[in-house]
């Protein structure tokens, strides 16, 4: 089933952009390879289960697949990161209202519409997360889907 899922997702067009995932444990300080399909959301509030996750990771993806239109819950704005995707740790950004800094991860490569440098990435992430913090709570349809429980490994460790 897993190989069929990956094969099917691989056929979808890549959707470059910034996507988010709740994060458990310390911020990564090196590269990591995604070990399984990693669900993320274009909405930081969804990805962090209303900012209850230990941390939030912002991922600059070149190859992520937008699966929201195919999802049972399209309002989650899900973007799948495929297995074997290499994510580089490119820093953190402090956001007022969050206990821990947002972890910044990025695929190698470029695509139109992505931040041109780390300063622009920090600015865009700060704006998106600040806007999400101001929104009302989002109904969590699938607890743990976008944010592993505290102490549970992330998709690449």
Report the location of each language-model feature.
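Mono-ADP-ribosyltransferase
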Residues: 1-157
């Amino acid at each position: 089933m897993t190989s069929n899922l990956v094969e099917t997702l691989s056929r979808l067009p890549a959707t470059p952009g910034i996507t988010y995932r709740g994060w458990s444990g310390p911020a990564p300080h090196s590269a990591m390879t995604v070990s399984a399909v990693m669900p993320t959301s274009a909405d930081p509030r969804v990805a962090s289960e209303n900012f209850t996750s230990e941390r939030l990771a912002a991922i600059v993806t070149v190859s992520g697949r937008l699966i929201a239109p195919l999802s049972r819950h399209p309002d989650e704005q899900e973007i799948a990161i495929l297995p074997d995707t290499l994510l580089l740790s490119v820093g953190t950004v402090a956001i007022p209202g969050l206990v821990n800094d947002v972890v910044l991860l990025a695929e190698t490569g470029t695509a139109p519409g992505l931040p041109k440098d780390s300063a622009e990435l920090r600015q865009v992430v700060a704006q998106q997360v600040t806007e999400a913090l101001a929104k009302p709570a989002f109904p969590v349809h699938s607890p743990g889907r976008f944010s592993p429980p505290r102490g549970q490994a992330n998709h690449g460790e």
